[in-house]
Amino acid sequence: MTAVLTPPALVTQASGGSAEAVVERRAARVPFPLASREVHPDDTVITLRPGVELGGRRVLLMGGPCAVESEAQLMATAEATAQAGGRVLRGGAFKPRTSPYSFQGLGSEGLRLLDLARRRFGLAIVTEAMDEDGLARVAEVADLVQIGARNMQNYSLLRAAGRIRRPVLLKRGLSATLEEWLLAAEYVLAGGNADVALCERGIRTFARETRNTLDLSSVPLVKTLSHLPVVVDPSHATGTWPLVAPMARAAVAAGADGVLVEIHPEPGQALSDGPQSLSLPQFAELAATLPLIARAVGRDV
């Protein structure tokens, strides 16, 4: 039996019943009880490090390169992220690439550089774990362990992520429904890790003008269905830098708890995803506009 994922408010409006009655009826059959707002009505707030929270009133700005390439590149990016008001540095040490001939990341050296950037600039770190073998190594450095879109339904990795004591950022799969996405989160929660955030990074559609299609409607819908924080990655969603800032602003307006933006000191020289990376000045310009939008929807940055 497949549950119909209709927000309680919409069910109530259609049926004329009370919200409490709807919750009671549906909580017993919701397929993802640990992730469900019907079972857990209060928003989850995840502490990444002292003073850095994901899911509270403050929208969390995250910036950094697709891949860690060198110490100079990462330190310049980390400094720009901190100066712009970002609280989290993203950067891939291990990169799952479509082509086996593409740059795959620096591996353990990339983790060392991320740890150096954290200590130097006071930023929290988000980076991806690609498999069970590398999960423990990544968790030693990351304040937020990313599970990428390709691994959203890697159930052995999800189970392992449930056993670590690090927050997890779970990206939506390329063709995943909201139910599949939330069920993937349920694997981590069921393993004992209560600190899970979701990341909308675009889905595959018939559109060819962008890399993916950013499903912004998923943000308010998932926040109705679930108590978990929701982050938006406008870089992978669009694949082209002129669209990143507008979609980041739209994400904040839609209620996202964080935005994850790819930036690079020299996007034209990036070893991966240069076309969707903002330059450091462009990132600063974007960051300056986000507080205005956040305040309009009752949030801060």
Identify the residue ranges that each predicted region occupies:
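Conserved anion-binding
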Residues: 93-97, 150-217
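Hydrophobic faces of well-ordered beta-strands that scaffold small-molecule active sites
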Residues: 60-65, 87-91, 125-127, 145-147, ...
